[in-house]
């Protein structure tokens, strides 16, 4: 959620910044509702002050018959106050709803562009594998090795699900443990295991609601949502809390399954693990001082990159343009890993700074010192990494001519010393 005072004082600037996201994002209704809201509030408070003052005068008079006119006048004032307050409630409800639908303002360092074609390559790492054979897609490799079973998963549940087994299941578990150990031991994150279902307030706090409800799996009676990412429960750990400056930065890492309806993705990545309704992910979440948020984003991105470097998977870092960043983000780096069968890079992690956008929605604040007024923290998060897509990258980049898969050196201790997956 954006700062109302900032928008009010910088309306043209805010509208211009939002325009770089693309689409028609007008703040005209914001201006109208804000003016109505302030006018009604002023009128109500003025009458309340008058009523309090006159009521004190009336209370001092022993013979109430001498102030009948004032008593009658105050009854009329009370009725007007109720009318103003009722109107104010309606206006504020619409105003608050509108605020929840306005996306974050892109950070000044975010490249301006309309779509992913205008994203900027920041850096690349690693050499692309040279193969003396036609590389197979990961689904063919996995089915030949009998480590992923898409057909039975479809029978069990439906499309866009996968059954991992044998070395495939072990490799997925190894990746989760490897990532969590790296982030908690070497990068200093605190490991947490949050609930996989959250309430509406949690989804609203991180920005998934109200705008993206159609993308979520919703349970009823009681109402809960299956999490689309660990970002949601982990960010909400400190919802409605005031932190100490000395506590910052707070860094969490969490493994969770993630659940997404993938609305609007019909026909995209219909085979394999790239786009699933359920997938595993290790997440990185930070709560930081506003002065440190950009530096902390660089650190967090580097921590996600380290996973790919240790697995020796070639990748590149992309700075997303203003038209491609997410609703809540002000700046985002995507990590894209090389997939030989597609002869291209595919996203494996998004690392974002949200400024105080999520903190305002979730009420996450801190104090510079005991006497200071609470301020909003800045939040950041990123995938460290998407486990299924990492498995895809390993299968494709480490495939051999005979269809076997070499296990990356860094994963072998987690695989019981297994060096190769064979038939």
Curated annotation (Swiss-Prot):
UniProt: L-serine binding residues: 229-231, 283, 383
UniProt-listed GO biological process terms: selenocysteine biosynthetic process; seryl-tRNA aminoacylation
Domain of life of the organism encoding this protein: Bacteria
Alphabetical UniProt keywords: Aminoacyl-tRNA synthetase, ATP-binding, Cytoplasm, Ligase, Nucleotide-binding, Protein biosynthesis
SUPFAM superfamilies xrefs: Class II aaRS and biotin synthetases, tRNA-binding arm
Positions contributing to ATP binding: 260-262, 347-350
Reaction catalyzed: tRNA(Ser) + L-serine + ATP = L-seryl-tRNA(Ser) + AMP + diphosphate + H(+); tRNA(Sec) + L-serine + ATP = L-seryl-tRNA(Sec) + AMP + diphosphate + H(+)
GO cellular component: cytoplasm
Pathway this chain belongs to: Aminoacyl-tRNA biosynthesis; selenocysteinyl-tRNA(Sec) biosynthesis; L-seryl-tRNA(Sec) from L-serine and tRNA(Sec): step 1/1
InterPro entries: aa-tRNA-synt_IIb, aa-tRNA-synth_II, aa-tRNA-synth_II/BPL/LPL, Ser-tRNA-ligase_type_1, Ser-tRNA-synth_1_N, SerRS_1_N_sf, SerRS_core, tRNA-bd_arm
Main location: cytoplasm
Protein's UniProt keywords contain Mitochondrion: no
EC class of the enzyme, as a word: ligase
GO molecular function annotation: ATP binding; serine-tRNA ligase activity
HAMAP family in the cross-refs: Ser_tRNA_synth_type1
The protein's role, per its UniProt record: Catalyzes the attachment of serine to tRNA(Ser). Is also able to aminoacylate tRNA(Sec) with serine, to form the misacylated tRNA L-seryl-tRNA(Sec), which will be further converted into selenocysteinyl-tRNA(Sec).
Family to which the UniProt record says this protein belongs: Belongs to the class-II aminoacyl-tRNA synthetase family. Type-1 seryl-tRNA synthetase subfamily.
Subunit structure: Homodimer. The tRNA molecule binds across the dimer.
Entry note about domains: Consists of two distinct domains, a catalytic core and a N-terminal extension that is involved in tRNA binding.
The protein's name: Serine--tRNA ligase
Organism this protein belongs to: Trichlorobacter lovleyi (strain ATCC BAA-1151 / DSM 17278 / SZ)
Gene giving rise to this polypeptide: serS
């Amino acid at each position: 959620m954006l700062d109302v005072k900032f928008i009010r004082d910088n309306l043209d600037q805010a509208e211009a910044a939002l325009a770089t996201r693309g689409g028609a994002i007008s703040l005209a209704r914001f201006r109208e509702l804000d003016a109505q809201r302030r006018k009604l509030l002023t009128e109500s408070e003025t009458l309340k002050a008058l009523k309090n003052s006159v009521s004190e005068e009336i209370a001092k008079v022993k013979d109430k018959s001498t102030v009948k006119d004032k008593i009658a006048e105050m009854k009329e004032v009370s009725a007007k106050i109720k009318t103003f307050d009722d109107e104010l409630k309606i206006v504020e409800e619409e105003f608050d709803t509108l605020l929840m639908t306005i996306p974050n303002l892109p950070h000044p360092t975010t490249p301006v562009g309309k779509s992913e074609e205008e994203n900027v390559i920041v850096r690349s790492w690693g050499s692309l594998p040279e193969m003396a054979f036609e590389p197979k897609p990961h689904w063919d490799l996995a089915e030949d090795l009998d480590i992923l079973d898409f057909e039975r998963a479809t029978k069990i549940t439906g499309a866009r699900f996968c059954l991992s087994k044998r070395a495939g299941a072990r490799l997925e578990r190894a990746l989760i443990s490897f990532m969590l150990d790296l982030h908690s031991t070497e990068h200093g994150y605190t490991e947490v295991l949050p609930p996989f279902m959250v309430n509406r307030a949690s989804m609203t706090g991180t920005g998934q609601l109200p705008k993206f409800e159609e993308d979520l799996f919703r349970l009823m009676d009681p109402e809960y949502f299956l999490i689309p990412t660990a970002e949601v429960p982990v960010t909400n750990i400190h919802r409605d809390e005031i932190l100490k400056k000395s506590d910052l930065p707070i860094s969490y890492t969490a493994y969770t399954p993630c659940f997404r309806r993938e609305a609007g993705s019909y026909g995209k990545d219909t085979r394999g693990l790239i786009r699933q309704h359920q997938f595993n992910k290790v997440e990185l979440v930070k709560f930081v001082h506003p002065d440190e948020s950009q530096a902390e984003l660089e650190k967090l991105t580097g921590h996600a990159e380290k996973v790919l470097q240790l697995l020796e998977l070639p990748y590149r870092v992309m700075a997303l343009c203003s038209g491609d960043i997410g609703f809540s983000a002000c700046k985002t780096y995507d990590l894209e890993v090389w997939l030989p069968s597609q002869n291209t890079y595919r996203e494996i992690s998004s690392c974002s700074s949200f400024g105080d956008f999520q903190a305002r929605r979730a009420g996450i604040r801190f104090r510079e010192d005991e006497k200071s007024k609470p301020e909003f923290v800045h939040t950041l998060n990123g995938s460290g990494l998407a486990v299924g897509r990492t498995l895809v990258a390993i299968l494709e980049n480490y495939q051999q001519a005979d269809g076997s898969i070499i296990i990356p050196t860094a994963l072998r201790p987690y695989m019981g010393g297994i060096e190769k997956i064979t038939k």
